[in-house]
Amino acid sequence: MVKVKVERSEDADESVVASGDVTIKEEESYDDKLIFVNAIAKPMAGKKLAKKCYKLVKKAMKHKTFLRNGLKDVQTRLRKGETGICIFAGDVTPVDIMCHLPAVCEEKGIPYAYTPSRADLGAAMGVKRGTVALLVRQNDEYKDLYDEVKEELSALNIPV
C-alpha cells in the first residue's frame, strides 16, 4: 500500500468539489423543511416565530443553566417543576419517543411549539448535532424577547 501525497493548489476548493469528495448542501427553505414534519407536530411555529425562537435560544445559550436541551433533560426538568418555554423539533423519528411531552406541557401550563428542523435547533445552540427538545427559562438579560415569544406561543392554537 502506498501513501498518496496531496498537493494543495490555489484552486484547491474547486478541485475538491469537482472530484466529488465534498458535497455542498444548499440551505433548505422553511417550506422545504415542512415536508419532513411529523403529523403530531402541532402547533407549528411560523417562519417569523421560528426565527425569534432561534434567536432566543442563542441568547439563552450564553447562560448554561437557563437552557435545557435534549429529551431526557427536558423531561426531567418538566417533571421537577421548572417553567419556561418548550421548543420541539417537528422532524423527529420515531415519534413515540417524544409524543407525550406536549401533554406534559399542557398539564403544567407551559407554552410550547414545534419548529420544522432539529438541525436548526442544534445550530441555534451553536452545536453541530441537532436536538429534539429545548426548555428555555427566563433571564433578565433577554426578558423582552422571552416575553414576546411566550406571548406569541400562548396565542397559537393548541390542537384538541
Curated annotation (Swiss-Prot):
Functional summary from the UniProt entry = Required for ribosome biogenesis. Part of a complex which catalyzes pseudouridylation of rRNA. This involves the isomerization of uridine such that the ribose is subsequently attached to C5, instead of the normal N1. Pseudouridine ('psi') residues may serve to stabilize the conformation of rRNAs.
Protein name as annotated: H/ACA ribonucleoprotein complex subunit 2-like protein
Example of a GO biological process term: germarium-derived cystoblast division
Which Pfam families would you find in this protein's record?
Ribosomal_L7Ae (PF01248)
Family of this protein: Belongs to the eukaryotic ribosomal protein eL8 family.
Q: Which Gene3D superfamilies match?
A: 3.30.1330.30
What superkingdom heads the lineage?
A: Eukaryota
Give the Gene Ontology MF terms in alphabetical order.
RNA binding
Please name the source species. Answer: Drosophila yakuba (Fruit fly)
What does the record note on quaternary structure?
Answer: Component of the small nucleolar ribonucleoprotein particle containing H/ACA-type snoRNAs (H/ACA snoRNPs).
Tell me the compartments it is located in. Answer: Nucleus, Nucleolus
InterPro entries the UniProt entry points to = eL8/uL1-like, Ribosomal_eL30-like_sf, Ribosomal_eL8/eL30/eS12/Gad45, Ribosomal_eL8/Nhp2
GO cellular component terms listed in the entry, alphabetical order? nucleolus; sno(s)RNA-containing ribonucleoprotein complex
Q: What is the lineage of its organism?
A: Eukaryota, Metazoa, Ecdysozoa, Arthropoda, Hexapoda
